Amino acid sequence: MNEINIQRIDTYEDERFDQEALNQHGCFVVNGKFPYQIKIISKDSALIKGEEKYYNEIINDFRFFAEHIINFYSMDGKIIKKFKPPTIFDLDLDKIQPTQFYIDRKKLDAVKTFVKNKEDIIIPVAKYEDQYISLDGHTRLYLAYKLGFSFIYAFITKSFDGTDYFVKESKKRGVKAVKDMILLSHEDYRQKWDKFCDEYFASLEN
């Protein structure tokens, strides 16, 4: 079986993809040459564009932290894949412990283009001791705080390896709530947060 390499595009400028999909971080390239994009169109549905050959792999990669997206359609409206919905519940914003210290201003600007109300914010969380830990969606959470939302929507999922470490490091830096995360320029974010993550995961290989 041929190995499949999936690269998720983390920039906001790429002529191969729609801007809306780029803003949602729903763009991928398989084996360096096959472009795919997934564009969320409602709270539980998305459109997928690209060669049908790798649909399953792209959808599975996309849903790693987006299990609330359960219906995937082709561009002509054909249902491609359907999943069982997770249990979604209201969660007070001030009860969430982040696993991230910083927010990228450029990503925040992108998120503002598609987050307009509470219903647009559904994030994966894990129970940790007596708290809920946010596993993804920190930019959306920060925007919720800035918009004055008192709660968002969430679903329980499995924590990732190293969750304990990221929680500990967040608290050590005084990041104990969504409002404590620090907004940085895109350049500073890459230098501080990306570097921190790279060094952590590199240490696991030693």
Where are these regions (language model features)?
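Basic- and aromatic-enriched surface patches that contact anionic nucleotides/nucleic acids
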Residues: 9-14, 18-21, 129-206
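Short alpha-helix boundary/capping and kink motifs at helix termini
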Residues: 2-135, 139, 145
